[in-house]
A protein has these predicted regions:
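Blade-edge motifs of beta-propeller repeat domains
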Residues: 12-42, 85-110, 146-170, 204-231
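Short coil/loop residues immediately preceding or within conserved phosphate-binding loops
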Residues: 5, 43-45, 78, 112, ...
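Hydrophobic beta-strand segments that make up the repeating blades of beta-propeller
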Residues: 1-3, 61-65, 128-133, 188-192
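Beta-propeller blade termini
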Residues: 46-53, 64, 113-120, 173-180, ...
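Beta-propeller domains
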Residues: 41-46, 64, 68, 77, ...
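Calcium-coordinating acidic loop motifs
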Residues: 14-15, 52-58, 87, 118-121, ...
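A short loop-to-beta-strand structural motif that recurs across blades of beta-propeller domains
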Residues: 7-10, 80-82, 141-144, 199-203
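Short glycine/acidic-enriched loop and turn motifs that connect beta-strands
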Residues: 4-5, 66-72, 133-138, 193-197
Length: 245
């Protein structure tokens, strides 16, 4: 959502694995609270990711926040990471008070537009991929934040720019990792808002699960994906909603 204080919406599937039916949303369930840090900034967007970051068998939440410091001009753009640990169970989640920039993650200059999580180097822990936008010249950089810790005790490095064959300047910002072609490695899918449509980009991992290599430019609107009459930055999530495997 926009801003630091909007919170979470949750819609339970009250149907089943093959015929999903989602209930009306509830706000801030499971002990979740909006985060209001004592920072001289206005939060613009939070992108939430559900992942078992501490390898204890339940889903935690890591949020990437884009913010602008309006305390002085020219305004400074920063990115933060907010962590909500699930201290409950997989079936009865309960989230702790959120904390800022855990696991070696730190406030970064410019803006990390969006990050996604996955074991990109095949070493058994969760890494990050994303894009950074420099608002001084609107240049984009592809970034990799490696987990040099473990699956249960993550520790993230500083961002590495333009690795795995992805150059700067790719005009797709909302990114997700998925083995879309089921060949055993993680590929990249993007979405990008245009004037009157939203495009989807696919960049295949032509390397391996351990040594990824991507070959841009993206294939646009592959696999029948298209939103020709809808404008917006859709965040891609891959789930088997109809239970067909």
């Amino acid at each position: 959502g926009f801003g630091y204080g909007l919170g979470f919406h949750y819609q339970e599937n009250i149907g089943n694995a093959t015929n999903p039916n989602f209930a009306n949303p509830t706000i801030n369930p499971f002990g979740l609270t909006a985060y209001s840090p004592a920072l001289p900034e206005i939060g613009l967007r939070q992108h939430h990711k559900f992942i078992d970051l501490d390898n204890d068998g339940d889903f935690d939440i890591l949020s990437n926040v884009r913010a602008v410091d309006i305390s002085s001009y020219p305004y400074a753009w920063n990115s933060h990471f907010i962590y909500y640990e699930n201290i409950g169970t997989p079936s009865n989640p309960q989230f702790s008070t959120p904390t800022l920039n855990q696991f070696g993650l730190s406030t970064t200059p410019n803006s990390i537009v969006y990050t996604t999580l996955g074991d990109i180097d095949g070493d058994g822990d969760t890494d990050m991929l994303g894009f950074s936008l420099n608002y001084s010249n609107y240049a984009t950089d592809f970034l990799f934040i490696e987990n040099i810790g473990s699956a249960s005790t993550p520790n993230y490095t500083a961002p590495q720019l333009n690795v795995f064959g992805i150059p700067s300047g790719i005009n797709y910002t909302l990114i997700t990792l998925e083995d879309i072609d089921t060949d055993g490695d993680l590929d990249i899918m993007f979405s990008q808002e245009n004037y009157n449509s939203t495009d989807f980009g696919f960049v295949e991992n032509t390397g391996t699960a351990i040594n990824p290599q991507f070959s841009p430019p993206p294939n646009v609107n592959s696999f029948g994906l298209s939103l020709a009459n809808w404008q917006g930055q859709g965040i891609l999530n891959f789930k088997d909603l109809d239970g067909d495997g």
